[in-house]
From Swiss-Prot:
<feature type="compositionally biased region" description="Polar residues">
    <location>
        <begin position="220"/>
        <end position="238"/>
    </location>
</feature>
<feature type="compositionally biased region" description="Low complexity">
    <location>
        <begin position="278"/>
        <end position="294"/>
    </location>
</feature>
<dbReference type="Pfam" id="PF13913">
    <property type="entry name" value="zf-C2HC_2"/>
</dbReference>
<dbReference type="InterPro" id="IPR026319">
    <property type="entry name" value="ZC2HC1A/B-like"/>
</dbReference>
<comment type="similarity">
    <text>Belongs to the ZC2HC1 family.</text>
</comment>
<feature type="zinc finger region" description="C2HC/C3H-type 1">
    <location>
        <begin position="9"/>
        <end position="38"/>
    </location>
</feature>
<dbReference type="GO" id="GO:0008270">
    <property type="term" value="F:zinc ion binding"/>
</dbReference>
<feature type="binding site">
    <location>
        <position position="142"/>
    </location>
    <ligand>
        <name>Zn(2+) 2</name>
    </ligand>
</feature>
<feature type="binding site">
    <location>
        <position position="138"/>
    </location>
    <ligand>
        <name>Zn(2+) 2</name>
    </ligand>
</feature>
<feature type="binding site">
    <location>
        <position position="28"/>
    </location>
    <ligand>
        <name>Zn(2+) 1</name>
    </ligand>
</feature>
<feature type="compositionally biased region" description="Basic and acidic residues">
    <location>
        <begin position="296"/>
        <end position="305"/>
    </location>
</feature>
<keyword id="KW-0677">Repeat</keyword>
<feature type="compositionally biased region" description="Low complexity">
    <location>
        <begin position="311"/>
        <end position="322"/>
    </location>
</feature>
<keyword id="KW-0862">Zinc</keyword>
<feature type="compositionally biased region" description="Basic and acidic residues">
    <location>
        <begin position="171"/>
        <end position="219"/>
    </location>
</feature>
<feature type="region of interest" description="Disordered">
    <location>
        <begin position="144"/>
        <end position="322"/>
    </location>
</feature>
<dbReference type="InterPro" id="IPR049899">
    <property type="entry name" value="Znf_C2HC_C3H"/>
</dbReference>
Length: 322
C-alpha cells in the first residue's frame, strides 16, 4: 500500500458504485457480488437503543420517521427565549428597586406584573394558563367539573327534599308568634259565653283580680306549710336532730348515771325529774372502788421496788466487806 502511486487511476464497482484501484477492484467485485445475492434484513438501531432504557421502541421509531421526513435533520423546537430573557431582567431590576427602597427609606415600588408566556394556552373555564402539554390534560377535566357544578345533579338521598314534597319550617320569630296566638286563642275560647239571644259574647278579663287571687292562694299555701312544720314533732330519723335543752347541773351526770336512765326519756323528764339517788350512789361506789384498787396496786408496786433495792444494797455492802 505504501508503494501505491497516488496518481493511479481508480475504477467504479459495477455493483455498489464505489471506486477502487484496478488491483483491488478485482478482489472487491467477487465479494460484492456474493453480498448482493444475500437478502439480509437491515439492522434496526432503534430496538438496540430501546433495550435497557426508559424509552419505548414506538417513541424511537416516531423520532426516526420525523428525521427522515425532514431530510435527516431533527426540527429544532421553537422557543421564545427572548421573551423569557426580558421577563428575567424585569424581575431582577424590580428586586434591586426594593432593596434600594429598604436601605434609603423611600416608598416601596409597585409589585411587577406577572407576564404570561405567549405560548401558553388559557383555559376557557377557569381562566388559568398552561403550556400545550398541560392544557391537553387540564381542559377536559375542567370542562367536566364545570358541567357537573352547573348541571346541579342532586343525589338520590336528597330527591325527596324538594319544595313540593315538604313544608318549609317557620323561623324563630314566626314560631313565637304562632305560640302566642294559639295561647291567646285558647284563653279567648274559655272566656266566651253565649247570651240569651244566641249570640256569643266575650267576657272581659280583669287582670288585677287574677293577680290578687293568685297572691292570696300563695299566702294561704305558705301559712299552711309553716303551720304544719311547727306542729310536727321532732323525730330521730336520718337527717333530722331534735333541739338540745340548755345545760343544767342536774343534766351534767356521769356516763354511768346516764346508762341507768330509761332508754328514750323526753325533754320534759330530763329537765324536771332528777336522777334517782340509788343509781348515783351505786355509780359513786363503783367509781370509788375502782380508784381505790388502782391506788393499792400502785402502792404495792412501790413497796416491792423499795424492798428489792434495799436487798440489793445489802448484798453489795457484804461483798465489799468480804
Amino acid at each position: 500500500m505504501d508503494n501505491a502511486d497516488p496518481n493511479e487511476p481508480v475504477y467504479p464497482c459495477p455493483i455498489c458504485g464505489r471506486k477502487f484501484v484496478k488491483s483491488s477492484l478485482e478482489k472487491h467485485e467477487s465479494a460484492c457480488r456474493k453480498l448482493a445475492t444475500l437478502h439480509r434484513k437491515p439492522f434496526d438501531s432503534g430496538k438496540q437503543r430501546a433495550n435497557g432504557s426508559d424509552l419505548t421502541y414506538a417513541a424511537i421509531k416516531k423520532a426516526q420517521n420525523e428525521k427522515a421526513k425532514n431530510g435527516g435533520v431533527f426540527p429544532r423546537p421553537q422557543t421564545n427565549w427572548r421573551e423569557r430573557h426580558g421577563n428575567f431582567i424585569d424581575a431582577v431590576s424590580s428586586s434591586k428597586r426594593v432593596d434600594y427602597a429598604l436601605k434609603t427609606g423611600a416608598p416601596l415600588p409597585p409589585p411587577p406584573k406577572t407576564a404570561v408566556p405567549s405560548d401558553y394556552v388559557q383555559c376557557e373555564y377557569c381562566s388559568r394558563n398552561f403550556n400545550a402539554a398541560a392544557a391537553e390534560r387540564h381542559i377536559p377535566f375542567c370542562r367536566e367539573q364545570t358541567t357537573r357544578k352547573q348541571g346541579g345533579k342532586s343525589s338520590a338521598g336528597n330527591r325527596g327534599l324538594t319544595s313540593n314534597n315538604y313544608r318549609s319550617l317557620p323561623s324563630k320569630h314566626e314560631g313565637r308568634k304562632q305560640e302566642s296566638s294559639s295561647r291567646n286563642g285558647s284563653a279567648e275560647r274559655k272566656t266566651t259565653t253565649r247570651g240569651r239571644d244566641g249570640s256569643l259574647s266575650r267576657a272581659r278579663r280583669d287582670d288585677s283580680n287574677d293577680l290578687t287571687n293568685r297572691r292570696k292562694s300563695l299566702e294561704t299555701r305558705s301559712q299552711l306549710t309553716t303551720g304544719q312544720a311547727n306542729n310536727r314533732t321532732t323525730s330521730l330519723s336520718a337527717g333530722t336532730r331534735p333541739a338540745l335543752p340548755p345545760m343544767t347541773p342536774s343534766s351534767k351526770r356521769s356516763s354511768s348515771a346516764k346508762r341507768d336512765l330509761p332508754p328514750n326519756p323526753t325533754t320534759h323528764q330530763r329537765l324536771k325529774t332528777p336522777a334517782p339517788k340509788t343509781t348515783t350512789t351505786a355509780s359513786a361506789s363503783r367509781s370509788g372502788s375502782g380508784s381505790s384498787s388502782r391506788t393499792r396496786t400502785r402502792d404495792e408496786s412501790r413497796e416491792s421496788r423499795l424492798s428489792q433495792a434495799k436487798s440489793n444494797s445489802r448484798n453489795n455492802s457484804r461483798s465489799r466487806i468480804f
